[in-house]
Amino acid sequence: NAPPNLTLR
């Protein structure tokens, strides 16, 4: 899974 930071943006 991609980092949450990238998911939010």
Swiss-Prot record:
Binds 2 calcium ions per subunit. GO terms for biological process: hydrogen peroxide catabolic process. Its EC number is 1.11.1.7. Keywords: Calcium, Glycoprotein, Heme, Hydrogen peroxide, Iron, Metal-binding, Oxidoreductase, Peroxidase. It comes from the Eukaryota. The keyword Metal-binding applies. The keyword Cell membrane does not apply. Disulfide bonds: none annotated. Glycans are attached at N5. Its cofactor is Ca(2+); heme b. It catalyses: 2 a phenolic donor + H2O2 = 2 a phenolic radical donor + 2 H2O. Removal of H(2)O(2), oxidation of toxic reductants, biosynthesis and degradation of lignin, suberization, auxin catabolism, response to environmental stresses such as wounding, pathogen attack and oxidative stress. These functions might be dependent on each isozyme/isoform in each plant tissue. This is Peroxidase 8. It comes from Daucus carota (Wild carrot). The lineage of its organism: Eukaryota, Viridiplantae, Streptophyta, Embryophyta, Tracheophyta.
